[in-house]
Every structure is written in structure tokens, then in C-alpha cells.
Amino acid sequence: MKQYAIQPATLEFNAEGTPVSRDFDDVYFSNDNGLEETRYVFLGGNRLAERFPVHSHPLFIVAESGFGTGLNFLTLWQAFDSFRSAHPQATLQRLHFISFEKFPLTRDDLALAHQHWPELAPWAEQLQAQWPLPLPGCHRLLLDRGRVTLDLWFGDINELTDQLDATLNQTVDAWFLDGFAPAKNPDMWTPNLFNAMARLARPGATLATFTSAGFVRRGLQEAGFTMQKRKGFGRKREMLCGVMEQHRMPTLSAPWFYRSGSEKRETAIIGGGIASALLSLALLRRGWQVTLYCADDQPAQGASGNRQGALYPLLSKHDAAINRFFPTAFTFARRLYDALPVSFDHDWCGVTQLGWDEKSQQKITQMLSLALPAGLASALNAEEAEQAVGVTTRCGGITYPAGSWLCPEQLTRAVIALATEQGLQTRFRHTLTSLVAQESRWQLRFTSGETASHETVVLANGHQINRFDQTQPLPVYAVGGQVSHIPTTPALSALRQVLCYDGYLTPQNPHNQQHCIGASYHRGDESTVWREEDQRQNRQRLLDCFPDAKWATEVDVSGNSARCGVRCATRDHLPMVGNVPDYHATLTHYADLADNKTSAAPAPVYPGLFVLGALGSRGLCSAPLCAEILAAQMSNEPIPLDASTLAALNPNRLWVRKLLKGKAVK
């Protein structure tokens, strides 16, 4: 299994209080005045003060080659806030900053470095509060209520730029070419990086860098930038600035997974669960007009209606895509839920998954071999597990200290209420029966006979996403399940964390003195009828896993209190996020894909029709990032996921994988 460790930066502070990298023997910023140097080199070198007021798009995108202490980002954020205060009516409303860092600082070192610039404290404190764990890949931080987005890519920039999705091509407005000096870190300053910068730069994009090294100037020129020298900051004689004046048409490396968005920011979302709610917020933040159609009388009547749900990442012993996606999705979910200005029952108590038999112990051993950061997942022996969860288990496992339980029903309703305050239009008791494309719009028809017309449509209606002609071929299936509600007892009330075994048991909700235990699993079953056998099995699985635990015998399901729901799942346990693929066109266009990959056209899709679904049993974990991914795609904005993992979420993936191998799609 692939190791997921990212090495943190090792640094010390010199006599001037400047952080110095031990790995590269170089300062993170100038001893003289790092803040002023950033303003001169990167903000001034890219002419941002004069460009912001005349920018013709609501979003300005900056990319950077080395995040370091975040000085460049914080300085830019401060300047952007000043611009917004001075020009509240300007077209430019939001800032998106993309940065790469191979050796991220620890949160403590970051805070120490930030003490150097007291005037940046209001922005630095927000960055520190959301500072991510050292996981490889992209970490999206939503700051200042979403007006500022920071994408932190942890890993080697020369490797990461090769892994970026094609939708990021020609989107960057300005480049900050920063990092340790070329003489100290020659591995970063490569033609591969310069070519990637050119590929990502939109026509007219600028760049600035502190160095004036000849090989850097020549490399950027060869990549396509028009370069010039400028007076350097302070004692430095020269620096470099550049402009992308060429207009290139980059090739698509995997056109069968290409994603397209929409220039028309108006949509209908079909659904009423957590995915619909979070997508509404993400689109509203980007200036969309959003109408939500829900078949029920109120939100959260489907799979999102449970009283308690566990929040922790899915890990796999064999699927690299799962192991890339879910840890990132989990950390994003925690940041988002923490920041939401709404109330819902929850407890960030942690989740512990136990190895109660040989098979489950082997699975946990394989999960631990991923070498995930301790802040995300770590091993527990039997004694440590009992101390963590508060009850006798007599077995060890893996613990997720940032895991939790929360009330999906309350969360969903609160988010939809928040979105309504921000402009969301809601239509309840609207059951969609069909979608018809009419003159670049979609006509929606409901059981009541009512119709509506929208520019774009998102299907986020759980296990019913494949009820329409366009989506019927999607390889998804329904999973019925029953969660039992049980009263607490003195012994059960000792449970401090969510306990996962061949089922799960939550700590009591102090607002109702009840636990949730579950859940039964019925593939292909859409029934929501209460079942006595499911109630009994929910209890029996706990007793089977912990036969010697007296506290487990106190689980009482005789009150017959439970909730039945239906989830939507896929064979590979990953969500479906993106354009709705045209099944018949896909099979026709890609009939000889295995032998003609180089000439393949972009994936056939239904224009303006999207899907967000198949979240399975980990919707609380995956829904926030999936909603953010789809909102970014629909808005033609940077997507916070590498191309390979993003392909693993594409609704057409199961068909395309077979076609790439020359196999028949059934």
C-alpha cells in the first residue's frame, strides 16, 4: 500500500527572528523586510494594485510555487481586503490562491513565523485556525466566508503540476514564482515547472520572481512568457517579470474524463438532503441563482434524516483512489462543519474502529500502513482503545481523533435555512418525473403537471438519481437500512467515542439521552418499512463482536424505535460527481478507444446536466468536498482534486475503464 507521509519542514530561527530551512540552508523571507519585499516583488511585479479595479471577472486567480510561511498569501489577502473596501462595487469579488509546498510547516512553526508581522495577525490567525494536516494533494481552505479560497497542494511541485486536472489549464491570472534560491533548491527550478506555469496561465497572465538568474529567464521565455528585468528589492540589483502573450490550445491527456461547466450561472437542484444543501451554499457563494426542488414536505426526509451519523474517512486495503479521496474529503468536511454559522447537535468526540476478530485486525493493520498523520488516524492497543472509548472492548484498533457524530437531519435543515437567507429558492412537494432538453435549457416536469425551465440542472436526489431517461444507465444501486434508537443506561453513558465494529454505536445525544446503533444493509431494497429482524440484528452484531462485554447487553431495542432510509451506492464505493454522461454516445464514440486513445474526443455528456450522488454510507464525510468540486466545475473554477482522483469520481468511469481495455460494457 502506498505510504502517505508528507515530511514537515525542519527549521530554526536566526538572530533576526527569521525562519531558516535546515534542509535548504536558506531563509524563508528576507532578513531586511520580508513583508515589503513581498509587496514589491510579487504584488508590484504583477501590477495587482492597478489590475484589480479593472479586472472583468468576479474571480482573480493567483498561483505560487512555494507557500513556505504564507507571507505572500497573507500580504496579498491584506491587499485584496483593502481593495474590496475601497471598491465595493468592482466586478472582482473573490480571490483564489493556489500554492504548492513540498515541506509544509507545522502549525506551531507557522504561528511562530507569523509573530514577525503583527500587522498581518488578523489574516494569519484565520490561516492558522484552518491549517491542514500533512496529507499529500490539495487542501482547500475557505476563508473570509468564502470570499478568499486557498488551495494548498502538499508535495513536489514538479510532480503535482503533472497531476493537475485539465480544467485548470489557462485559468491563472498571476504567478508568484517563489521558493528557496535556485542555487539552494535547483530541483524545483526546472523546465517542467516553467512549462506547467505557461500551461496554466491564461492569455495576458503575469509572473514575478525575486531571482534574475539567466537560466530562469531563458526557461520561462522558452515556455512562452515574454520576460523583462526589473530593479530588485533593496540591495538586490534585479528581478524578473513576465507576461503570457501567447494563446495556446493545450491538449487533453484524458479527454474521456474531461469536465465541462456552464457560463450561465442559474440552476435547479433536485433533492433535499445534505448534498443538495451544501451544493446550494457552494453555488450561492459563487453568485449563482439556485432553485431547490424537493419531493418531500421538508428537507432531510431521505437518507440525510438520521438522528446521529458518524463522521470519519473510509480507508481501503487495495483502492488507491479511496485512500486519496476520503482523507482529503474528511479534513475538508471538518473545516467546513466547524465554520458553518448554524447550530446542530454534534460532538467532536472521535471515532474508534476496532479489530474484533482476525479479519478486521488484518484490515486495520493494512489501513495503518498508509502512514496517515497521527492527527487523522493512529493505532490503539486494547488498553488504549478502552481508555479512548470509555467501555471495555478487549481489542485494539484505529482511532480518528477528529472524527465525530452529528445530527444529519438538523445539519441539512440548518444549511438549507442558511442558503435560503442567501437567496436560495425552495420548492417542496415537487416530484420530478422527466427532464427534456429544449433550446439550450432544461424543462422539468413534475407529478403535479407543473413545469419549470432552467439553464442547468443538478440531480442530487439520492437513490432516485437514475429514474430519468438520461441517467437510467448509471451503474448505481439502492441500499436500504435501519438504524435503531436505544435509551442510554449508566453503563452505556460511559461511551465517549463513536464505536465502529461490524456495525456502529454512537455516544448518547445529551439532548435526548439516546444512542443510535446500526445499521442493517439490504442491497437493492428501497423499502422504508420498519423490520423487527433488523432491530434484533443491530443489537446482535454488537453482542457477537463483544461477547464478554457486560455493557453491550444493556442495549435495549425493545422499544422498537428506529429510522429506515435508503442510500445510493456504487460498486467501487466512490461518489458520482460531474456531468451526466450520454451512455449511448459514449459507447458509440469510444467503441475503439482501446486502440485510438490519442485521437479521442472529449467525453459525450448532456450539456448543462450534472449529478451529485452515490454517497453511500459516508455522505457526511464526502458531501462537503463533492459539493465544492461540482460547484467549482460548474463555475469553470479550479477544482480541488488531482486528475486521477477526480477521474475516479466521474460518472462515466465504470464504462470508460472497460472501454479503455477493449471490453464490452453491459
From Swiss-Prot:
Q: What does this protein do?
A: Catalyzes the last two steps in the biosynthesis of 5-methylaminomethyl-2-thiouridine (mnm(5)s(2)U) at the wobble position (U34) in tRNA. Catalyzes the FAD-dependent demodification of cmnm(5)s(2)U34 to nm(5)s(2)U34, followed by the transfer of a methyl group from S-adenosyl-L-methionine to nm(5)s(2)U34, to form mnm(5)s(2)U34.
Give the molecular function GO annotations.
flavin adenine dinucleotide binding; oxidoreductase activity, acting on the CH-NH group of donors; tRNA (5-methylaminomethyl-2-thiouridylate)(34)-methyltransferase activity
Question: What GO biological process terms are annotated to this protein in UniProt?
Answer: methylation; tRNA wobble uridine modification
Q: Which domain of life is it from?
A: Bacteria
Q: Which UniProt keywords are present, listed alphabetically? A: Cytoplasm, FAD, Flavoprotein, Methyltransferase, Multifunctional enzyme, Oxidoreductase, S-adenosyl-L-methionine, Transferase, tRNA processing
**Location of the protein in the cell:** Cytoplasm
Q: What is its EC number?
A: 2.1.1.61, 1.5.-.-
Cite the InterPro entries for this sequence: FAD-dep_OxRdtase, FAD/NAD-bd_sf, MnmC-like_methylTransf, SAM-dependent_MTases_sf, tRNA_MAMT_biosynth_bifunc_MnmC, tRNA_MNMC2, tRNA_S-uridine_synth_MnmC_C
Task: Respond yes or no to whether keyword Metal-binding is given for this record.
Answer: no
Q: What is the name listed in the Swiss-Prot or TrEMBL entry for this protein? A: tRNA 5-methylaminomethyl-2-thiouridine biosynthesis bifunctional protein MnmC
Q: Name one GO cellular component term.
A: cytoplasm
User: What ranges does the record give for the region FAD-dependent cmnm(5)s(2)U34 oxidoreductase, renumbered to this chain?
Assistant: 270-666
Q: Which reaction(s) does its UniProt entry say it catalyses?
A: 5-aminomethyl-2-thiouridine(34) in tRNA + S-adenosyl-L-methionine = 5-methylaminomethyl-2-thiouridine(34) in tRNA + S-adenosyl-L-homocysteine + H(+)
Q: Which HAMAP family match?
A: MnmC (MF_01102)
Cofactor dependency: FAD
Q: Which family does it belong to?
A: In the N-terminal section; belongs to the methyltransferase superfamily. tRNA (mnm(5)s(2)U34)-methyltransferase family. In the C-terminal section; belongs to the DAO family.
Q: Which species is this UniProt entry from? A: Salmonella paratyphi A (strain ATCC 9150 / SARB42)
Chain residue ranges for the region called tRNA (mnm(5)s(2)U34)-methyltransferase: 1-245
One Pfam entry name = Methyltransf_30
